[in-house]
């Protein structure tokens, strides 16, 4: 599974820049490397499977993160 780098919106409204997908050194789990486009920033990682999953919010299923645009 792959993920396109770019700007994504979290289902709660925050926007994030996805840098790419990395592999965990111990178990080879795929992790999304991203940073918030607000506040102090910093790099974060989240398992790829969790990043692309559907979540229930206010009674409806939606993507946890939705692609907005490429960052060039």
What kind of feature is each model-predicted range?
Residues 1-72:
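Mixed-charge, low-complexity intrinsically disordered regions
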